């Protein structure tokens, strides 16, 4: 056995790393499932509860509102009280709220419960990515963090399968569909029990003995934590907008929003869009393109390993924008439309791996959860607003203008990435989060 001193950042991948990754991915599987099943449940909920279009939209978007709140609040709390407590609490909340959906009797009940589910998921996004980043070795950190997109997509596709199965002639099937999310959530809650605290966070709090005890227990007595600097001050959300960090905050928030808006808009309304752009069998196109999301996410893992993160993101923004512009210029039903939609689906799924990597690597330990939480919150706010506006935009201006607007959003993401994106690939976590270091690419404006 090798007993020479080695930094935690330089360790080979081991079973403990895989365990933390699997427990983190459980949140993304559940998130994809929760956001996917609601579209099918609303088919039955609309006549059963006599939903108005506004109330149906509120139920559909309530989990995104919760994600916004949970990402901000629980991310900030975890920087103060630790990662492990929120890592466990978030899924207790998700499990309970998911189960209680079975007994909902009014639209307001469902909205409240799905906001609670979203709060749990939002907090878990902030803390899960942070905890995984703080344990992962630098050579494997990108793949581990980026793999969440694959798992999220699997959850989303499983929701489609469950939706087709549950939504039948039984008018109460929606209860079983929504409550079914409690099963994976309960399993994840039980498996997370006993997860250790982040030693990097403990070291930042001056709790040296606890930090080194965790490192020695899970990695060995020869493993060193690295170059974390102890800080006595507590950080607040205004720290993200200080002269030191505002570019990192702006980049991570804007690039996340600019990827999520076209993703959620197109895939929330995929059957409608498929018909509008002239795809003959909307259901077949929807199922095929959902399957392509998994292919794209797997391709993204390979590209994340091969390419610099910054170049991968810049190239993807340009390709996605160009694809939508060409689609907007084609006549409805053009033979090229499906091919371009396949290219768009694969590319956006592939590059979405970076939303799990870049925010977690862009901030130092004492504000990492806060930074990840803020970027996630902004992405969910953008998704909720844009998804809600899509029917109105389609009715007012049509599909051509809608696609051009989405292309504009992607070009904004390109510009912000070019101006402020750091290159964090394969760096020690301390160096990746070091503003002003050799990895900086900020352009003064």
From Swiss-Prot:
Gene Ontology cellular-component annotations: plasma membrane
Predominant location: membrane
Keywords: Cell inner membrane, Cell membrane, Membrane, Transmembrane, Transmembrane helix, Transport
PROSITE patterns reported in the protein's UniProt record: MFS (PS50850), SUGAR_TRANSPORT_2 (PS00217)
Signal peptide per UniProt: none
Cytoplasmic side, ranges: 1-22, 78-85, 136-142, 197-253, 308-311, 359-369, 422-445
Coiled coil: none
Membrane topology value: Multi-pass membrane protein
Membrane-spanning residues: 23-43, 57-77, 86-106, 115-135, 143-163, 176-196, 254-274, 287-307, 312-332, 338-358, 370-390, 401-421
Entry-linked SUPFAM superfamilies: MFS general substrate transporter (SSF103473)
Subcellular location per the Swiss-Prot or TrEMBL entry: Cell inner membrane
Spans within the Periplasmic topological domain: 44-56, 107-114, 164-175, 275-286, 333-337, 391-400
One Gene Ontology term of the molecular function aspect: transmembrane transporter activity
PANTHER family assigned to the protein according to its UniProt record, in alphabetical order: SYNAPTIC VESICLE GLYCOPROTEIN 2
Family to which the UniProt record says this protein belongs: Belongs to the major facilitator superfamily. Sugar transporter (TC 2.A.1.1) family.
Protein name from the UniProt record: Inner membrane metabolite transport protein YgcS
Species: Escherichia coli (strain K12)
Organism ancestry: Bacteria, Pseudomonadati, Pseudomonadota, Gammaproteobacteria, Enterobacterales
């Amino acid at each position: 056995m090798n007993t020479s001193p080695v930094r935690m950042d330089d360790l080979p991948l081991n079973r403990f790393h895989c365990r933390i990754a699997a427990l983190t991915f459980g949140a993304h599987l559940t998130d994809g499932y929760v956001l996917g099943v609601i579209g099918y449940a609303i088919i039955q909920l609309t006549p059963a509860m006599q939903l108005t279009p506004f109330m149906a939209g509120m139920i559909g978007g309530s989990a995104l509102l919760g994600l916004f709140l949970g990402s901000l609040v629980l991310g900030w709390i975890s920087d103060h009280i630790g990662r492990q407590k929120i890592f466990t609490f978030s899924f207790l909340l998700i499990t309970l709220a998911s189960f209680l959906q079975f007994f909902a009797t009014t639209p307001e009940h469902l909205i409240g419960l799905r906001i609670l589910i979203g709060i749990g998921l939002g907090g878990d996004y902030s803390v899960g990515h942070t905890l995984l980043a703080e344990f992962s070795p630098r050579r494997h950190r990108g793949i581990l963090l980026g793999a969440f997109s694959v798992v999220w997509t699997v959850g989303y596709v499983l929701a489609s399968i469950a939706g087709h199965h549950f939504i039948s002639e039984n008018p109460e099937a929606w209860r079983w569909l929504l409550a079914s999310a409690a099963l994976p959530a309960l399993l994840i809650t039980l498996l997370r029990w006993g997860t250790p605290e982040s030693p990097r966070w403990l070291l930042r709090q001056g709790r040296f003995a606890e930090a080194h005890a965790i490192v020695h227990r899970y990695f060995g007595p020869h493993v060193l934590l690295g170059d974390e600097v102890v800080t006595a001050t507590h950080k607040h959300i205004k720290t993200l907008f200080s002269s030191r960090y505002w570019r990192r905050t702006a980049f991570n928030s804007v690039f996340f929003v600019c990827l999520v808006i076209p993703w959620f808009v197109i895939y929330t309304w995929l059957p409608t869009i498929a018909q509008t752009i002239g795809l003959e069998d909307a259901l077949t196109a929807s199922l095929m393109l959902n399957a392509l999301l998994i292919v794209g996410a797997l391709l993204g893992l390979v590209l994340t390993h091969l390419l610099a993160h910054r170049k991968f993101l810049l190239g993807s923004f340009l390709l996605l924008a160009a694809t939508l512009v060409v689609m907007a210029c084609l006549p409805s039903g053009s033979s090229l439309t499906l091919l371009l939609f396949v290219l768009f689906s694969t590319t956006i799924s592939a590059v979405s791996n970076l939303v799990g990597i870049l925010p977690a690597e862009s901030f130092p330990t004492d504000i990492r959860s806060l930074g990840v939480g803020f970027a996630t919150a902004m992405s969910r706010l953008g998704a909720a607003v844009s998804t809600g506006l899509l029917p109105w935009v389609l009715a007012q201006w049509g599909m051509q203008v809608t696609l051009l607007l989405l292309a504009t959003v992607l070009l904004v993401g390109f510009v912000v990435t070019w101006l402020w994106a750091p290159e964090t690939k394969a760096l020690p976590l301390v160096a990746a989060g070091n503003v002003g270091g050799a990895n900086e690419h900020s352009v003064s404006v």
